[in-house]
């Protein structure tokens, strides 16, 4: 396959074995590659997009391939997902909607472009938008921020400040980093702290991914049912 020749997608036997341990110490590329791919592809496709991001399916598909290649570092964490993760996902959705005001003008522009397209094209775009938002993005972002950044910050600070203080510093710093890659900075910071707490509670990346996915799923439902397109 073509992706086998792209280094970021290549998984060596050593990385596959490291993935069974699901730590970034020996499988760093698996944690950071999916988000790097999403950001890189968005920068490239953004150049060829107009006011409406019609190339989002390319963005989502590339991210999905990268996530699939990194599956060994997170798939075992879904065997025992906590109820807390689901609850945090729901609460974070409510906070996001409360903190981010709906933009009528942006929604109107979005709807005009979407409804002007052929029905099949709009349907395909919406399908990829939902899959990207609910599946690909949560996994890619949680691998990079909680699985890699928070893990390493806590590990680095712990010898100097103790485990509890290190965890707090890591959650806060990672929350800031998470916020800076989102347009709604304040809401994203709150979400980042929430997902960081869920991750640190049991040290299970799957919990953070589920919480994030639940939030994004509820946002997607909210957007589609009420046509509040500005949240996308």
Predicted regions and their residues:
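Transmembrane helix-loop-helix hairpins at the membrane interface
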Residues: 1, 121-232
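Specific transmembrane helices
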Residues: 2-12, 23-138, 217-232
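Membrane-interfacial, low-structure loops and terminal tails that flank and connect transmembrane helices
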Residues: 7-27, 151-162
């Amino acid at each position: 396959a073509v992706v086998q020749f792209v280094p970021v997608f290549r998984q060596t036997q050593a990385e596959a074995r490291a993935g069974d341990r699901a730590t970034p110490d020996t499988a760093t590329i698996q944690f950071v590659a999916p988000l790097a791919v999403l950001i890189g592809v968005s920068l490239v496709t953004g150049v060829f997009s107009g006011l409406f991001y019609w190339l989002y399916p390319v963005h989502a598909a590339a991210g999905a391939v990268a996530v699939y290649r990194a599956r060994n570092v997170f798939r075992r964490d879904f065997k025992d997902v906590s109820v807390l993760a689901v609850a945090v996902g729901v609460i974070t959705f409510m906070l996001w909607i409360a903190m981010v005001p709906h933009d009528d003008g942006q929604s109107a522009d979005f709807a005009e472009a979407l409804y002007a397209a052929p029905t099949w094209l709009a349907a395909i775009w919406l399908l990829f938008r939902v899959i990207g938002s609910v599946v690909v993005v949560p996994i890619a972002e949680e691998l990079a921020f909680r699985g890699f950044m928070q893990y390493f910050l806590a590990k680095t600070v712990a010898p100097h400040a103790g485990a509890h203080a290190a965890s707090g510093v890591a959650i806060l710093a990672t929350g800031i980093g998470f916020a800076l890659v989102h347009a709604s900075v304040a809401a994203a910071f709150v979400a980042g702290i929430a997902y960081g707490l869920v991750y640190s509670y049991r040290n299970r990346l799957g919990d953070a991914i589920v919480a994030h996915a639940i939030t994004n799923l509820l946002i997607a439902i909210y957007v589609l049912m009420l046509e509040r397109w500005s949240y996308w």
